[in-house]
Amino acid sequence: MKNQHTENKQLPKLVVILGQTASGKTDWSLYLAKKFNGEIISADSRQIFKKMDIGTAKTPGEWRWDGFKKTYYVGDIPHYLIDFLDPGKYFTSAEFHDQAIKYTKLIHGKNKLPFVVGGTGMYIQSFVDNYKMPRIAPNKKLRRSFEEKSEMELLEWLKQVDPISAEIIDQKNKRRLIRALEVSILSGEPFSSQQKMGEPLFNILQIGIKKEKEDLHQNIERRIDEMVKLGIVEEIKSLLKQKYSWDLPSMSGVGYRQFREHLEGKETLEQALEKLKKETKHFAKKQMTWFKRDQRICWSETVEDAEKLIEDFLKK
């Protein structure tokens, strides 16, 4: 769906690097940001959380003073919207939209090129199309009634009130199911129909990383094996000890919830890992289903292809 959002040459430019989990976004974005004097805004709904590094495959970095504020650096590249939120807190797509716009303007103010990098499709689309998002406050009473339902029961309910969201949502993520239902019920409109495009703010090039399924699955398996070596089980135990519960948004995502039965003595570690590998591959498939809806994305197999796309984009 072509529209003026990516074609308005008068607007400030930015580049989006998107792709499935374990597709190589980090390496590409660091190389390209260095090449084109850029800074990075993370569009990853899991890497926003502090204390959650291994299960989110967060890019190792450090907080440094940058003028009067601290900024997360990976090497010499500043990163925003990463490692900043307590795991007990909530962060909506609407909040991401607002914060990403703020940091994009900050980066432009330094005469640098903003790179928005991640795999959270809702974050990216809300930003690219300047969505006017539903601002429905969480309803504790409604949420308590939802919590008593299983994921399958919630999904069946969502299919009735919002079949579009039901098709593309992470069906094992109870938090997201609850939020989609909550917004649909309290507003009286399907969650998926409430995201309206606003006026374009930026001239945007979207680059997607194209990865063969077999290669991607090998990357996923390697990453999960590495997570165990790095101490994912110990990371989760530490979070539970700090009273972060399994029903929090931070703990209900891929990379964490799959270890619950193991830590409760109901599964072996090997069973938990097999489940994580299977569900991560399914999650990657869902990501691609989301991205394929946007015909404006330029798919690249190599970082050199992406580099050429950016060079041409900046010349226009």
Task: Enumerate the language-model features and the residues they cover.
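Phosphate/pyrophosphate-binding catalytic cores of soluble transferases and nucleic-acid-acting enzymes
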Residues: 1-316
